[in-house]
């Protein structure tokens, strides 16, 4: 990926990730699909070794000839398929996997700053004083250190539509331990303190930015766990080690049930927007087309 970014540059979808999601939603609806927002799936129904639909948190059952899960494979197998026998992705195997780091993400908007800090572009990496020791704290020890390395995203320098005229949109991302360590970070007590530490680092890069903040929102590993059902609040699903990458990740065609397919960061080929979109393209080649009768019905409508 490093070579591709250096050789061909970094692509940005105007309007941001929301524009991509909106475009996908339009395609689904144009094909007669329905999107139910704010709806939890409690389990995937498995009958005779095949996926036959889902049961929602309300108890409603939706029958289907096949099921595609874009939940993290850890959640799909440990929770959504908790009542079904599994041969490969049992709870013990999933618990023994190495999960990626957690993320502390601070989103904020600033007023009247578009012409300020000209050295801060769309993408900025701010390296901390330590490298290998910080990685050990994050990945091995589960220790939340006071020092950090940050990625700063300022999309408004490329896409003015993401902020009011003259203003800016930012997020600052810091790698932090996930919640699966022996003594996980209690973010209910640490969130505001860590936000202040991040602000102190950013102040060196963008003097005076704190006085211009108009809105803000913070995500912690607890947010990723509760909002996105990510195991241990990990930011990128399974850690992309050699034996947890590409083909060694849970397969797009589930090994546990016929008619069950996986898509997203935790499956092949991996995490990140390019990886997730690629997994959808892979699935487009693997999932059978809708039966002709259903297609004719949609055309008639």
Residue spans of the language-model regions?
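A glycine-rich dinucleotide-binding beta-alpha-beta segment and adjacent secondary-structure elements
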Residues: 145-153, 204-269
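Helical element adjacent to the flavin cofactor pocket in flavoenzyme catalytic cores
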Residues: 1-57
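A conserved FAD-binding loop/helix module that cradles the flavin
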Residues: 265-288
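Active-site-proximal substrate-binding core of FAD-dependent oxidoreductases
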Residues: 43-46, 219, 288-301
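Hydrophobic, well-ordered secondary-structure elements that form the walls
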Residues: 68, 108, 172, 202, ...
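Mid-domain catalytic core of redox enzymes
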Residues: 13, 42-164
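C-terminal segments that line or cap access tunnels to active or ligand-binding sites in enzymes
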Residues: 112-224
